[in-house]
Amino acid sequence: MKLTSQASGTFAIAPTPFHDDGRIDESSIDRLVDVYTEVGCNGVTVLGILGEAPKMDSAEAAAVATRFIKRATSLQTVVGVSASGFAAMRGLARASMDAGAAAVMIAPTPNLRTDDQITTYFKQAVEAIGDDIPWVLQDYPLTLSVVMTPAVIRKIVMDNPSCVMLKHEDWPGLEKITALRGFQKDGSLRPLSILTGNGATFLDFEMERGADGAMTGYA
């Protein structure tokens, strides 16, 4: 089932297990998925920052995504497809969706500085992967060095109907959640799922501000 703006609950951010020689540890992927399922997660996110995607070539990344997707039959799987080029992003996004992923996740590249650069980048990313693929907007300025204001996030979401979720990981970021939910109340922002990160450190407060759950993990 594809991800929608009504998504909520807990999505575990999965690490990618490796053997000592650098090969992907596929049996450990299966065990990770089984644990996430047993504890009641609603979904799993793979090949994110915690998933160490830059350590893999395109074939390995696709294989990891597919292994998670095929094992996680009762979970919605979100695949991180951020890349330095749109061709690689498109290839992994299409392969992941063909394998049964619920959505993909896209982060801004660290060189983006102005609001126009940020909004244009995501428009081009959607054109590259196809507007039929639901996607998660990753907002993690502490690591990615790209600051997206609530107004910029609103423009990205309104310009790209296939964006169904915000992975919110700003710190401090409570006012950002409040602002986005305020936009929805005044009709300037359509429905959008908001899941938060930061190790769930502020989850109680984030839920009070209108978050729909958490997308986070530990390794």
Name these PLM-found stretches.
Residues K2-V147:
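Active-site beta->alpha loop and helix N-cap motifs at the rims of alpha/beta catalytic domains
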Residues A128-G130, Y140-A219:
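Catalytic alpha/beta core domains of metabolic enzymes, predominantly
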